[in-house]
Amino acid sequence: MADLKSTFLDVYSVLKSDLLQDPSFEFTHESRQWLERMLDYNVRGGKLNRGLSVVDSYKLLKQGQDLTEKETFLSCALGWCIEWLQAYFLVLDDIMDNSVTRRGQPCWFRKPKVGMIAINDGILLRNHIHRILKKHFREMPYYVDLVDLFNEVEFQTACGQMIDLITTFDGEKDLSKYSLQIHRRIVEYKTAYYSFYLPVACALLMAGENLENHTDVKTVLVDMGIYFQVQDDYLDCFADPETLGKIGTDIEDFKCSWLVVKALERCSEEQTKILYENYGKAEPSNVAKVKALYKELDLEGAFMEYEKESYEKLTKLIEAHQSKAIQAVLKSFLAKIYKRQK
């Protein structure tokens, strides 16, 4: 794994160098420095799970055959395209949410001299994906499918973000709009497609597969993405911020979180009143009341039960798949996220 990570980081250096020398733009020393700093901070700064999982998935689809140097480079490059996509989403997401930290560091727009320039940086990150795809995949038989895939997933994610933002619109804080169904829709589109389906879809295309023949794989991965986001919602409230690498703000931000939806299902009339009065307010005393209510309603227990049921359901779906190679890909994904702490 350490070896794969160092190979993966070497490919990042190649891709970054390509972009810093892009012939379509005359860079000044200052603009090249800005771009390099922005890329290192936002693209390279994450856990790299999504990107690395393209390489892992492709290896598993090759069923133990060693990858050629070219296959290794291309699978890493596709992994980095997903990391670029993630960086683009997060840079803009943090501005929209007015977040403070990301990955244990100040959000990019909070850095001195960055501010709203971060919006243009987000646009650049989005454009880089297609420059990488064009440079390294243009001659591949699956190039058009790759471009379509990235466009489709970006569109789905932006629509998920839209539902999230309009559901949690600041001027209309109405908890009655929140339900498990709305939560699922937001998560499916905003997180599951790009975080879970996209890495495996990239590996399948590289392996010469037609994605239309793998809708069952998409279904399992979307379900896995929903489980992952429910974990995220749980950790936002119950995990230690040091371990998590960020300060959870779902309560303050009036997020349509799995916890608040479950709380609404379990609340008495009196408890509902407490939730309505305190949810979505930034004062520490309001946040503390919501957290105390979550404890009272035993949402930790509800989450443990949900986690167990999800794991069993996903395992059953995976084991029903006819391809052992695809089973291995899906099992490796599930193993990475089951009972995670951050």
Swiss-Prot record:
Major localization class: cytoplasm
PROSITE patterns, alphabetized:
POLYPRENYL_SYNTHASE_1 (PS00723), POLYPRENYL_SYNTHASE_2 (PS00444)
Q: In which pathway does it act?
A: Isoprenoid biosynthesis; farnesyl diphosphate biosynthesis; farnesyl diphosphate from geranyl diphosphate and isopentenyl diphosphate: step 1/1; Isoprenoid biosynthesis; geranyl diphosphate biosynthesis; geranyl diphosphate from dimethylallyl diphosphate and isopentenyl diphosphate: step 1/1
Compartment(s) of residence: Cytoplasm
**Cofactor(s) this protein requires:** Mg(2+)
**Catalysed reaction, written as an equation:** isopentenyl diphosphate + dimethylallyl diphosphate = (2E)-geranyl diphosphate + diphosphate; isopentenyl diphosphate + (2E)-geranyl diphosphate = (2E,6E)-farnesyl diphosphate + diphosphate
Q: Listed GO molecular functions?
A: (2E,6E)-farnesyl diphosphate synthase activity; dimethylallyltranstransferase activity; metal ion binding
Tell me which residues bind Mg(2+) 2.
93, 97
* Record carries keyword Hydrolase: no
Instruction: Alphabetically list the UniProt keywords.
Output: Cholesterol biosynthesis, Cholesterol metabolism, Cytoplasm, Isoprene biosynthesis, Lipid biosynthesis, Lipid metabolism, Magnesium, Metal-binding, Steroid biosynthesis, Steroid metabolism, Sterol biosynthesis, Sterol metabolism, Transferase
The record lists isopentenyl diphosphate as bound by 47, 50, 86, 103
Q: What is its EC number?
A: 2.5.1.10, 2.5.1.1
Q: Which residues bind dimethylallyl diphosphate?
A: 102, 190-191, 229, 246, 255
Query: What's its job?
Result: Catalyzes the sequential condensation of isopentenyl pyrophosphate with the allylic pyrophosphates, dimethylallyl pyrophosphate, and then with the resultant geranylpyrophosphate to the ultimate product farnesyl pyrophosphate.
Q: Which GO terms describe its biological process?
A: cholesterol biosynthetic process; farnesyl diphosphate biosynthetic process; geranyl diphosphate biosynthetic process
Mention any one GO cellular component term assigned to this protein in its UniProt record: cytoplasm
Record-stated family: Belongs to the FPP/GGPP synthase family.
The residues listed in the UniProt record as binding Mg(2+) 1, with positions renumbered to this chain, are 93, 97
Keyword Transferase: yes or no? yes
What binding details are noted for the cofactor? Binds 2 Mg(2+) ions per subunit.
Q: What is this protein called?
A: Farnesyl pyrophosphate synthase 2
Q: Which Pfam families match?
A: polyprenyl_synt
The record lists the organism as Arabidopsis thaliana
